[in-house]
């Protein structure tokens, strides 16, 4: 058995010197540490509410941190995980922290979060080399570069408290479909101690509990009695078969809930006095913004040990003494000043009188120095989850048709599924945002777990309390099997036997039949059978995924819909004749599907490597188990054991599992319950091409750049028409295009295959587009077989650029015609994604594009580009220069503005540059749909920054970046957001828009966004607030009205 000390030696090079010393001290002085921790816990819990964790980041046993490291090391060896790649914004994307910014700011010597796949190499090094590494790291720490020059924001401190964020739940506990369960440990480590026991939202089973499981009785008993009346309709087994032999999922801290009823007062906690929503809650403040500025000064010592001295500084910077004491940064602040706790408020036991410093007396250099303390970054996980909250609350909007509101429920559920599949395992391993933030790390994981469970609470409350009754009011009924008449049951039984029964495959689990492999996000039925007096068998049945989830009963006058699982559960006797069915319940599993693509640089065929990795995903670790409320505890325990899951991975749901399948309801032929259909229009400059045969799309582009705003203008009449014209034009000699995602029945792929017979066609297909890997591999094979030159891009980088080039022979020689877009070449999503694309034949852009394609296909070395900005080459540095130029103009008293539209913002260098520009006086407006880690509106730092988020019937997917440039505006469109992964781990393209009319159009688009009455405004503590009074009509409606006026011709096939 490997001891703790031996394990520490094995992973010696994974931690810096300070952390190693802490681990060794913890191992050698457990008794002393435990005593100290116990005292800390006792003190800090005075400010905590019952059942919640303490706010203090140091609460908990120190030995638990060492235990976490050992446990995490063990899991990482069993399951290598890719900690660099993430799924994309087209799939509600996520990515990780800017983990290597620390290394970049310290000349490449910064300490990164360890990748478990690198441990074998590191363990092979000699102990002497390890010692020299530690000395080198220590030296580099002492010679950290000037933080003002580096402009790097580092991750540190505990800005967000798990306890406080739990309070943001807007669910009425007495009426919520999910109820709390207490966990005694995290990550399967019993030694984590009682300080880590927390209350998380987990629902109570409805089935009748045994008498000895009921703690006190009246409320639980009455609730369970009420539940019995609905047991059969919910697929429960007969009461006589379960009452005495099977244990329900115990009565937990709250009585079970039989039915979720509409609650008129449900929304009150998320509505302020002006009746507008605030996410996560009106009553909750994530950050103590009033004290944040002074707190930044107080905590500079936690992150900066440098010799920087400003000429305008009052006093000296913090310097840490050997005893841990500090010297003041500014005169008047003593080393005994109050230290803020985890959520930015002042620890109750440390409250003292503090001398505040007027903001006007704090010089700009001090403000910039404070930024390196990194408490100005909103938490990455919370930012993503609050984005899900904003999507979810669109389902509240009473002005939306009911089926569109149901669609937002499905979108939120789908996003949450992807979150678990991409992030959950990484969180469990402890590699995301934990090493440099909350300690012990369990607190951070608990916070995210509580937030996801609260979000699930919200999803089911909105669906069951609000939307389901409203669907019924609109004659759309989602019924249960027990609601059917006998003739309808007979008819559905015939339907089942003819269309479903042949697809069913019961799989028993016994000595001769191992536990079956479960596919990701599959819905399954757990059945317990009894063949004779002594033998019981567990059988798993997968609900077929190739048949609809909902069945429409057309005999009824209204829309009556029954879930497929209800039909299967009611007809299980046809699968098990002459067998007694003891219990039947539903469960759904989620697997980690972001495994590392190992050996990419050594693979002979990337296509075959992708196929191998896709196969491995079918056996990836489980990360979540959702079960129906009526599942017996014995079955649940068996599933947890077989799937290697713990209690906090289980979600017991009092409602339908897999709400993302509600997308099927949105396809019902009920136009009066949906948005009025929008038919895209033809760009006015392309309307006359059909009337005048001498005209073609290339002659239109030669007259000037063409900017197309999708989906208001037609993708088919612009982008698709451009490619198809190139295929048919005999003067076109070559077509080159990069495809990241496209639709399954792509006309574009067919056109390229046709062109390959008589033209040079080069197609770059990114095989690593998350979620579309399998489809892209099929397209790659199809294109190769048609004669196209197919490339898979650069090793180690995704090719996310959306670019196409047509080479045409003309009188003056060859000319390149280009299309550069912010969105994919996907006709299916082009109708619902808001994107911008540019058509141009600029010679400089053409030369740049030729060089770029040669770089992508032939690894040719390109020293520079004339106009194009390419990530990871020069895009980030150019953006920082553009931001710094605005800051310089503002300091000189000139007008300076930055307007940007994007999907997400988390790159620390860009955030830091924006903070400094704000301090300089630049007016900054950011339209960020999703994750945003900048904090706007903080006096003296970001008061010139405004952040809004727009959600609506179309998904805002554009990337537009505009800079005032002293009255000579510079405008760009790009495939990249201001996310670290886009700027460092992908091939992205940003192109300048030169035409004055097009620049004006981009500014008009941004102006419409800023006046959107449906926008969410980001508050300075990270929450979002819905605008209370309409400034103007919502932006998407205004774009549709403008399109009707400027481009009156509607596209038709």
From Swiss-Prot:
InterPro entries noted in UniProt: PP_kinase, PP_kinase_C_1, PP_kinase_middle, PP_kinase_middle_dom_sf, PPK_C_dom2, PPK_N_dom, PPK_N_dom_sf
Active site (UniProt): 800 (phosphohistidine intermediate)
Top-level EC class: transferase
Temperature dependence: Optimum temperature is 37 degrees Celsius.
Polar residues bias: start-end ranges: 143-155, 1036-1046
Subunit annotation: Hexamer. May form higher oligomeric structures in the presence of ATP.
Record-given protein name: Polyphosphate kinase
């Amino acid at each position: 058995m490997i001891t703790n000390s031996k394990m520490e030696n094995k992973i010696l090079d994974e931690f810096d010197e300070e952390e190693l010393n802490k681990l060794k001290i913890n191992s050698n002085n457990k008794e002393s540490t435990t005593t100290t921790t116990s005292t800390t816990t006792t003190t800090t819990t005075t400010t905590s509410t019952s059942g919640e964790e303490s706010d203090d980041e140091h609460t908990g046993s120190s030995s638990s941190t060492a235990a976490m490291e050992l446990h995490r090391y063990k899991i990482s060896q069993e399951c290598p995980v890719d900690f660099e790649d993430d799924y994309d914004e087209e799939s509600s994307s996520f990515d990780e922290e800017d983990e290597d910014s620390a290394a970049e700011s310290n000349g490449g010597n910064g300490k990164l979060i360890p990748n478990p796949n690198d441990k074998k190499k590191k363990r092979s090094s000699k102990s002497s080399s390890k010692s020299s590494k530690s000395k080198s790291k220590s030296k580099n720490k002492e010679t950290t570069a000037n933080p003002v020059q580096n402009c790097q924001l580092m991750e540190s401190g505990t800005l967000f408290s798990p306890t406080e964020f739990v309070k943001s739940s807007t669910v009425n506990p007495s009426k919520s479909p999910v109820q709390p369960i207490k966990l005694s440990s995290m990550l399967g480590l019993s030694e984590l101690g009682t300080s880590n026991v927390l209350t998380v939202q987990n629902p109570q089973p409805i089935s009748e509990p045994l008498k000895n499981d009921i703690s006190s009785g009246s409320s639980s008993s009455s609730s369970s009695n009420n539940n019995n009346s609905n047991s059969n309709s919910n697929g429960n087994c007969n009461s006589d078969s379960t009452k005495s032999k099977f244990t329900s999922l115990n009565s937990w801290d709250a009585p079970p809930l039989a039915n979720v009823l509409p609650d008129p007062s449900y929304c009150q906690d998320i509505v302020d006095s002006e009746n507008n929503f605030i996410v996560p809650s009106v009553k909750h403040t994530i950050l103590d913004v009033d004290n944040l500025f002074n707190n930044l000064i107080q905590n500079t010592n936690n992150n900066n040990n440098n010799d920087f001295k400003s000429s305008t500084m009052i006093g000296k910077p913090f310097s840490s003494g050997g005893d841990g004491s500090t010297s003041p940064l500014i005169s008047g602040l003593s080393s005994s000043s109050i230290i803020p706790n985890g959520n930015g408020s002042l620890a109750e036991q440390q409250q003292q009188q503090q001398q505040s410093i007027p903001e006007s007396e704090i010089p700009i250099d001090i403000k910039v120095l404070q930024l390196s303390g990194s408490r100005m970054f909103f938490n990455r996980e919370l930012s993503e989850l609050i984005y899900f909250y904003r999507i979810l609350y669109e389902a509240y909007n009473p002005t939306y048709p009911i089926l569109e509101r149901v669609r937002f429920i499905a979108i939120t559920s789908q996003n949450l599924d992807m979150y678990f599949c991409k992030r959950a395992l990484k969180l469990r391993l402890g590699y995301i945002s934990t090493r440099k933030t909350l300690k012990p790390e369990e607190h951070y994981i608990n916070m995210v777990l509580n937030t996801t469970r609260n979000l699930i609470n919200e999803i089911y409350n909105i669906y069951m309390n609000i939307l389901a009754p409203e669907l019924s009011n609109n004659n759309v009924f989602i019924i249960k099997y027990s609601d059917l008449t006998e003739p309808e049951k007979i008819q559905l039984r015939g339907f089942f036997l003819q269309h479903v029964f042949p697809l069913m495959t019961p799989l028993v689990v016994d000595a001769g039949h191992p536990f079956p492999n479960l596919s990701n996000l599959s819905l399954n039925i757990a059945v317990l059978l009894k063949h004779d007096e002594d033998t019981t068998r567990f059988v798993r049945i997968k609900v077929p995924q190739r048949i609809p989830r909902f069945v429409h009963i057309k005999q009824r006058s209204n829309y009556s819909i029954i879930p497929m699982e209800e039909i299967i559960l009611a007809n299980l006797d046809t699968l098990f004749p002459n067998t007694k069915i003891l219990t039947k319940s539903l469960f759904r599993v989620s697997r980690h599907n972001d495994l590392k693509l190992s050996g990419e640089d050594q693979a002979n065929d990337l296509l075959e490597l992708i196929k191998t990795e896709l196969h491995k995903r079918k056996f990836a670790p489980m990360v979540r188990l959702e079960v129906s409320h009526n599942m017996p505890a014995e079955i649940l325990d068996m599933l947890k054991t077989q799937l290697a899951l713990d209690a906090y991975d289980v979600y017991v749901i009092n409602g339908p599992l897999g709400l993302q399948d509600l997308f099927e309801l949105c396809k019902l032929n009920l136009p009066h319950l949906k948005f009025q259909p929008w038919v895209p229009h033809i760009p006015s400059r392309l309307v006359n091409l059909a009337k005048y045969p001498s005209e073609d799309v290339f002659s239109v582009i030669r007259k000037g750049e063409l900017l197309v705003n999708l989906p208001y203008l037609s993708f088919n009449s612009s982008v698709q028409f451009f490619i198809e014209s190139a295929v048919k034009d005999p003067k076109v000699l070559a077509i080159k295009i990069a495809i990241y995602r496209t639709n399954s029945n792509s006309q574009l792929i067919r056109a390229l295959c046709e062109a390959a017979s008589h033209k040079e066609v080069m197609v770059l297909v990114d095989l690593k587009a998350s979620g579309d890997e399998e489809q892209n591999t099929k397209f790659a094979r199809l294109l190769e077989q048609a004669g196209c030159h197919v490339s898979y891009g650069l090793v180690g980088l995704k090719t996310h650029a959306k670019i196409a080039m047509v080479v045409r022979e003309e009188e003056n020689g060859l000319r390149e015609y280009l299309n550069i877009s912010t969105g994919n070449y996907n006709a299916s999503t082009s109708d619902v994604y808001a994107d911008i694309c540019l058509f141009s034949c600029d010679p400089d852009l053409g030369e740049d594009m030729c060089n770029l394609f040669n770089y992508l296909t032939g690894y040719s070395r390109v020293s520079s580009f004339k106009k194009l900005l390419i990530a990871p080459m020069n895009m980030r540095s150019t953006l920082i220069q553009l931001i710094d130029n605005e800051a310089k103009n503002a300091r000189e008293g000139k007008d300076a503005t930055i307007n940007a539209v994007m999907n997400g913002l988390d790159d620390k260098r860009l955030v830091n540059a924006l903070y400094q520009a704000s301090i300089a006086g630049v007016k900054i407006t950011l339209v960020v749909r999703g994750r945003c880690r900048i904090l706007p509106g903080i006096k003296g730092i970001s008061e010139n920054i405004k952040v809004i988020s727009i959600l609506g019937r179309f998904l805002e997917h554009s990337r537009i970046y505009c800079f005032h440039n002293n009255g000579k505006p510079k405008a760009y469109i790009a495939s990249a957001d201001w996310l670290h992964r886009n700027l460092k781990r992908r091939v992205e393209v940003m192109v300048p828009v030169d035409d004055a009319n097009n620049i004006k159009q981009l500014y008009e688009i941004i102006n419409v966004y800023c006046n959107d009455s449906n926008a969410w405004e980001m508050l300075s503590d990270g929450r979002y607030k819905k605008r209370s009074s309409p400034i103007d009509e919502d932006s998407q409606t205004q774009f549709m009205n403008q399109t009707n006026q400027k481009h009156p011709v509607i596209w038709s096939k």
